[in-house]
Amino acid sequence: MKIDGYTRMAAVVANPIKHSLSPFIHNLAFDLTDENGVYLAWEVESKKLAAIVENVRNLDMYGLNISMPYKGEIIKFMDELSPAAELIGAVNTVVNHSGKLIGHNTDGIGFFNSLKKYDFKIENKQILVLGGGGAAIALIAQAALSGAKKIVVAARKSASYDPLNEKLAKLSAKTGVEILLTDLSGADRLQKELNQTDLLVNATSVGMDGASFPLEKSLLLPDKLLVVDAIYKVRETPFLHWAKEQGAQTENGLGMLIGQAAESFYLWTGKEMPVDKITLEMEREV
């Protein structure tokens, strides 16, 4: 890596963040594209966010990636939000346009870009998402923005169930796309929705231990279903193994991780990240 007086910086900001794979991905991308940049990981306290944002301008940085717990808090420092970031209510990428800071959310678009190798396009398709956390909302919002026909969200009944239902109703009203919430434990209803589904996504952390399972194993998957697990630290979760045994195409979360990074990289540099080469390196790293 060449570092000189012309080198520009980007960084990921979160707490904690020292475990992040983002520096590996982006610094490799800078090298492979001959872009004179460097990417760092900054673990900062909330009270330092304002100073960090100002340094993006002062140091003419490309921008920032934002991870937990600051994806919502960073919004107040933005000059403008992309449609996806505004709809999701979270920013994971800050882009510096000559001192004007624009907040984007690349999680959803990165996810769907990672499915292009399956010739999958979300337009006019039905999607079933397991979970209602931040990752799920990003996928749901992007699916709606990209013209999905119907989105079904399955979550367990808990204190967050009714607030999630309200949030999904607002997303539906803003996008005009039908978005329904159903109980994850309701096997009959899930089977009915699965029969009409083109894409099934596990957006929960269930399965990260390599043993737990997010839904009823008695459910039957329709033909030609694409099944994705957002988890990438376990190469094939029990969920993906179950889907593969039923003949489904399967994809783990590594594509989503690299996909959102590729979208950020493009917004900063105008260059396409060499995703295939980086995926090969990441498969050795993870």
From Swiss-Prot:
One of its GO terms (biological process) is shikimate metabolic process. It catalyses: shikimate + NADP(+) = 3-dehydroshikimate + NADPH + H(+). Pfam families: SDH_C (PF18317), Shikimate_dh_N (PF08501). NADP(+) binds at residues 131-135, 230, 253. InterPro entries: Aminoacid_DH-like_N_sf, NAD(P)-bd_dom_sf, SDH_C, Shikimate_DH, Shikimate_DH-bd_N, Shikimate_DH_fam. Pathway: Metabolic intermediate biosynthesis; chorismate biosynthesis; chorismate from D-erythrose 4-phosphate and phosphoenolpyruvate: step 4/7. Its EC number is 1.1.1.25. It comes from the Bacteria. Shikimate binds at residues 20-22, 67, 92, 107, 232. The active site is at residue 71. Keywords: Amino-acid biosynthesis, Aromatic amino acid biosynthesis, NADP, Oxidoreductase. One of its GO terms (molecular function) is NADP binding. Homodimer. Involved in the biosynthesis of the chorismate, which leads to the biosynthesis of aromatic amino acids. Catalyzes the reversible NADPH linked reduction of 3-dehydroshikimate (DHSA) to yield shikimate (SA). PANTHER family: BIFUNCTIONAL 3-DEHYDROQUINATE DEHYDRATASE_SHIKIMATE DEHYDROGENASE, CHLOROPLASTIC, SHIKIMATE DEHYDROGENASE. Belongs to the shikimate dehydrogenase family. This is Shikimate dehydrogenase (NADP(+)). It comes from Lactococcus lactis subsp. cremoris (strain MG1363). The lineage of its organism: Bacteria, Bacillati, Bacillota, Bacilli, Lactobacillales.
